């Protein structure tokens, strides 16, 4: 009976495979929005104000960072929790595939969230005159919470790796 439960639990990891595939569909949706934004701004490029162009560019950078985060979570999560990716040697392979454990993934996700939050905060500050002060304060507090959380997670990971716990 114990063996049956252990085998069933181990096999249940495959339930995550469609979830990771769903993230690839989310990446497709993000790519569509990315190019929609580009095609929206290009016809007006000569008449758009510099500050508006910068806001669009920051939005594109933000979407790119989110896309990178999706790819990292998809591949690393699949490899860590479902199965190794069998990619032929002659094909282009990402250098970090197979080398990122759950702890490294967590730290990279935290760093990506801080970067995404930074871009968002910069976009907010570019339009600060139209945003109430208390809302600006909350944006900064939330961003600092992300930064502090990423720092603490990295520090705890360093302590765990050094064996001083």
From Swiss-Prot:
* Residues annotated as transmembrane: 15-35, 53-73, 136-156
| Example of a GO cellular component annotation carried by this entry | plasma membrane
Q: How does it sit in the membrane?
A: Multi-pass membrane protein
Q: Which cysteines are joined by disulfide bonds?
A: none
Q: Name one Pfam family in it.
A: UPF0114
Keyword line: Cell membrane, Membrane, Transmembrane, Transmembrane helix
What is its subcellular localisation? Cell membrane
The family annotation for this protein states: Belongs to the UPF0114 family.
PANTHER family in the cross-refs: UPF0114 PROTEIN YQHA
Q: What is this protein called?
A: UPF0114 protein Ent638_3411
